[in-house]
């Protein structure tokens, strides 16, 4: 039996809903963790199960314990924190502050903000390269992706972190979130106000466009082998599948209303998508056969149940209920933490 938990960031309720996944089609909600006001973005975890989520209506991060399923503390950052990323080694976290137009560097041993770096208008979500050298941040209000050299943090030098490039997307495109493909060669950017996905060549910073036909890009994930990128498009309740090598759309997948965040479980090749829609106002294409799911749920899609390389067949789905306003979803495998440590952490909470 697997010991995996799904964490849904539920903005309107101010909670993180926790759903246990013990096997295919086996899901049950086990807890709703109260955090700060208007949490946004996926919970990001250290290897030891320290989770962090942005409280956008405040100037804090909430830390939650993946084992005890409780809020541990809040850490002050800039105004309107929106996205974050944890550097390899789990010592530092970067936070984009949409209200302060800045990037915070937080020391996770001291649990304090070390400094803020000015960015463009309204920075949103980010990713950090696997070697811990670079951070890419969507600057939503100014239409570019900020590339920062964060390699100094390997030696604890927060003062060395600096912006090295502003990679243009389009001022009207509003780049919202991004992800780095498993090979580390390309960055895929979801744009909320453009009908295309922007793809950045990491080596050259050159950009390419992949047309999806509709505005409303929100989240990006990849298959484990790096062959396919999956992009949620909120306005038409679809996931678009893109061949990473050819940069061609191979198909779309109808999902629940208002899809935003998504995560792929590489163990059984299922995807989980946040259905953010507060009401049924999504314009669904007539040719789609969307699952009849409501808002405030997750859509689970079995990505093995139909081809990904062509528009053929229908996928198998499951609806999972969470809190109000789910905007992001992540997974954490509790079996990566030794059993003795898990038991000790639960005992400390119950004592």
PLM features: what roles do these ranges have?
Residues 1-351:
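Predominantly soluble domains enriched in secretory-pathway, periplasmic, or organellar proteins
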């Amino acid at each position: 039996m697997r010991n995996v938990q799904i964490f849904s960031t539920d903005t309107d309720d101010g909670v993180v809903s926790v759903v246990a996944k013990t096997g295919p089609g086996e899901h049950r909600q086990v807890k709703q963790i109260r955090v700060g006001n208007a949490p946004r973005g996926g919970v990001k975890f250290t290897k030891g199960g320290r989770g962090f989520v942005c409280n956008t209506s405040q100037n804090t991060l909430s830390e939650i314990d993946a084992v005890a399923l409780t809020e541990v503390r809040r850490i002050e950052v800039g105004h309107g924190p929106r996205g974050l990323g944890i550097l390899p080694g789990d010592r530092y976290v970067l936070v984009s502050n949409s209200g302060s137009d800045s990037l915070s560097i937080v020391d996770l041993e001291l649990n304090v903000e070390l400094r803020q770096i000015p960015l463009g208008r309204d920075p949103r979500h980010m990713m950090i390269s696997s070697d811990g050298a670079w951070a890419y941040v969507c600057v939503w209000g100014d239409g570019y992706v900020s590339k920062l050299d964060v390699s100094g943090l390997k030696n604890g030098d927060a003062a060395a972190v600096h912006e090295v490039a502003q990679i243009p997307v389009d001022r009207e495109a509003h780049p919202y979130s991004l992800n780095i493909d498993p090979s580390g060669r390309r960055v895929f950017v979801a744009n909320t106000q453009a009908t295309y996905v922007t793809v950045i060549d990491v080596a050259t910073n050159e950009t390419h466009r992949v047309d999806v036909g509709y505005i409303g890009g929100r989240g990006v994930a990849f298959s484990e082998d790096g062959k396919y990128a999956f992009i949620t498009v909120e306005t038409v309740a679809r996931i678009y599948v893109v061949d990473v090598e050819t940069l061609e759309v191979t198909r779309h997948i109808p999902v629940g209303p208002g899809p935003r965040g998504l995560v792929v479980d590489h163990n059984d090749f299922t995807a989980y998508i946040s259905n953010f829609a507060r009401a049924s106002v999504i314009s669904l294409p007539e040719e789609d056969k969307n699952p009849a799911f409501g808002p405030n749920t997750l859509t689970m899609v079995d990505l093995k149940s139909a081809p990904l390389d062509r528009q053929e067949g229908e996928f198998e789905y499951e609806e999972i209920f969470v809190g109000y306003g789910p905007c992001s979803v992540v997974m954490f495998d509790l079996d990566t933490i030794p059993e003795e440590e898990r038991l000790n952490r639960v005992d400390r909470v119950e004592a």
